[in-house]
Regions:
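Walker A/P-loop phosphate-binding motif and the immediately C-terminal alpha-helix
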Residues: 2-38
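Residue-level preference for the first positions of well-ordered beta-strands
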Residues: 2, 30, 101, 136-138, ...
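C-terminal boundary of histidine-terminating zinc-finger modules
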Residues: 227-239
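Conserved catalytic-core segment of NTP-binding enzymes
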Residues: 26-27, 117-216, 221-225
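Phosphate-binding/switch loop-helix module in NTP-utilizing enzymes
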Residues: 75-143
Length: 257
């Protein structure tokens, strides 16, 4: 199972991605969680300590590694489009609570048509994770839709779009569904977060097709408290973990995932 979790900034996608990863790891399944967000904080949500996280350099920032694998140098305009990457998750990933974390980062100067060495490297790594790893792979994507335009997540089993009860968030889901279709990804599901009341629930149900809605997560200050204390929501909030467990069960029931 290979899932890309996406959504607008601040909607709670990292909390969802990290807790989902912890739930699969608790079952004894091999889990790889890849942080593809420039504001990398998936590690904290997984339960890593700050000292370990401070020692991690995103793959996209490892200039020597990128040069070594792609052959790209300052004076060389040519580089390999198919670099060796199959050893990178095990060599550079860090493990905590049964989850292997791989911090990929992003190519800040990317854009829709970027074919720079760093982008080639990241796309190859994600492609390897999606097509060749036997692990449960959960990608915590950068906020927005740029990664869809670059085709970075091509080949995943599904996109899970985390949204809030609001028109702009719903529009993000619609845009992801349209762009995912262009990448050949048929499964686009929704998790509604920060739901406060019946009015919010009705708003979500009236705008998201029932077959696409995996579930709702209710607004919970324990998530904020966990973040303040640098703890994983999985370890801090039984309520949040229970709600995401129900969503996970629905994911598991879907044979296409």
């Amino acid at each position: 199972m290979k899932i890309a979790v996406t959504g607008k900034g601040g909607v709670g996608k990292t909390t969802f991605a990290a807790t989902l990863a912890r739930l699969y790891a608790a079952e004894g399944r091999p889990v790889l969680a890849a942080d593809v967000d420039p504001d990398a904080n998936l590690g904290l949500a997984l339960g890593f300590d700050e000292e370990t996280l401070d020692s991690i350099v995103p793959i996209s920032k490892m200039r020597k590694l990128v040069e070594e694998r792609t052959g790209a140098t300052a004076g060389n305009q040519f580089y390999h489009l198919n670099p060796k990457v199959d050893d990178i998750p095990d060599k550079y990933g860090k493990v905590c609570n049964g989850v292997r974390l791989l911090v990929l980062g992003t190519v800040e100067t990317g854009g829709g048509g970027c074919v720079c060495p760093e982008h080639v490297m990241l796309k190859r790594i994600i492609n390897n994770l999606v097509l060749r790893r036997e692990d449960v792979v959960i990608l915590d994507m950068e906020a927005g839709l740029e990664h869809l335009g670059r085709g970075t997540t091509e080949g995943v089993d599904a996109f899970i779009v985390v949204i809030e009860p609001g028109a702009r968030s719903v529009q993000t889901y619609k845009n992801v569904k349209r762009l995912a279709s262009d990448l050949g990804v048929a499964q686009v599901k929704v998790v509604a977060n920060k739901v406060r009341n019946e009015e919010d629930e009705e708003f979500i149900r009236s705008r998201i097709p029932a077959e696409d809605l995996l579930g709702m997560l209710h607004y919970n200050t324990e998530v904020i408290d966990a973040d303040r204390q640098g703890k994983s929501p999985y370890d801090f909030s039984q309520t949040v973990t229970a709600e995401i467990t129900k969503i996970k069960e629905k994911i598991d029931q879907n044979s296409n995932l």
